[in-house]
């Protein structure tokens, strides 16, 4: 029996500056409000209608620190996380909230460079802040994230590993083919 999949992908705009706090163990937690909008034409009136949905996002660990440092109100961001519901009691009443959690398996990617008014404006670019182990690069870009012309950087936080006294095995670079004339220049597209 399948265990199920809990994965949320959002591309949206920060509605306010992120709120960063630190747990007693020193880990960062960042909360932010992310707006996503969709637009369509009403068939009856012919007018454009826009609906904005607000999402609560909680980030943990290194990605939370980075979000607190670089995200501001109006920043566009790509988020990969999971849907999670919390329960607590306040004044004898049970309360619930559902939020998107970005933890060790989640990803945050800044889109569109720095927001206007930033002192270091013009450096542009974005970063892919991913706390999980590096994933193999794909030969084609993902279709769910908007394309950027600015360079991107990956910041990966790998889980701590035990140090080994043996040197890591060296991989040999692939050798180029010796006979370049054997390639067919007629590409079928």
Curated annotation (Swiss-Prot):
Query: Where does motif Important for interaction with partner proteins map?
Result: 184-189
Q: Per its UniProt record, what CDD domains does this chain match?
A: SSB_OBF (cd04496)
What Gene Ontology molecular-function terms does this entry list?
single-stranded DNA binding
Keyword DNA-binding assigned: yes
Region Disordered: start-end pairs: 110-189
Keywords tagged on the record: DNA damage, DNA recombination, DNA repair, DNA replication, DNA-binding
Q: Which Pfam families match?
A: SSB
Q: Which domain of life is it from?
A: Bacteria
Can you cite an annotated GO cellular component? nucleoid
Please provide the Gene Ontology terms (biological process) for this protein: DNA recombination; DNA repair; DNA replication
Q: For the SSB domain, which residue ranges apply?
A: 5-109
Low complexity compositional bias, start-end? 112-121, 130-179
| Bilayer-spanning residue ranges | none
Could you tell me which InterPro entries the record lists for this protein?
NA-bd_OB-fold, Primosome_PriB/ssb, ssDNA-bd
Kindly indicate whether the keyword DNA-binding belongs to this entry: yes
Which PROSITE patterns does the record match to this protein? SSB
Q: How does it assemble?
A: Homotetramer.
Q: HAMAP family this protein is in?
A: SSB (MF_00984)
Its biological purpose is as follows: Plays an important role in DNA replication, recombination and repair. Binds to ssDNA and to an array of partner proteins to recruit them to their sites of action during DNA metabolism.
This chain belongs to the protein called: Single-stranded DNA-binding protein
Q: What species was this sequence derived from?
A: Pseudomonas syringae pv. tomato (strain ATCC BAA-871 / DC3000)
């Amino acid at each position: 029996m399948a265990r199920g999949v809990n994965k949320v992908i959002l591309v949206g705009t920060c509605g306010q500056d992120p709120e960063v706090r630190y747990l007693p163990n020193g880990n960062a937690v960042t909360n932010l409000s992310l707006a996503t909008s969709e637009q369509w034409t009403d068939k009856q009136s012919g007018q454009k209608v826009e609906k904005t949905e607000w999402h609560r996002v909680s980030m943990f660990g290194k990605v939370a620190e980075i979000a607190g440092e670089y995200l501001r109100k109006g920043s566009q961001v790509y988020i990969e996380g999971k849907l999670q519901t919390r329960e607590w009691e306040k004044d004898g009443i049970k309360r619930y909230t559902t939020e998107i959690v970005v933890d060790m398996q989640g990803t945050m990617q800044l889109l569109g460079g720095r927001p206007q008014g930033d002192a270091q404006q013009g450096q542009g670019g974005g970063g892919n802040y991913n706390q999980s182990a590096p994933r193999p690069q794909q030969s084609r870009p993902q279709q769910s994230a908007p394309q950027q012309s600015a360079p991107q950087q990956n910041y990966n936080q790998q889980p701590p590993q035990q140090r080994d006294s043996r040197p890591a095995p060296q991989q040999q670079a692939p050798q180029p083919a010796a006979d370049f004339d054997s390639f067919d220049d007629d590409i079928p597209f």
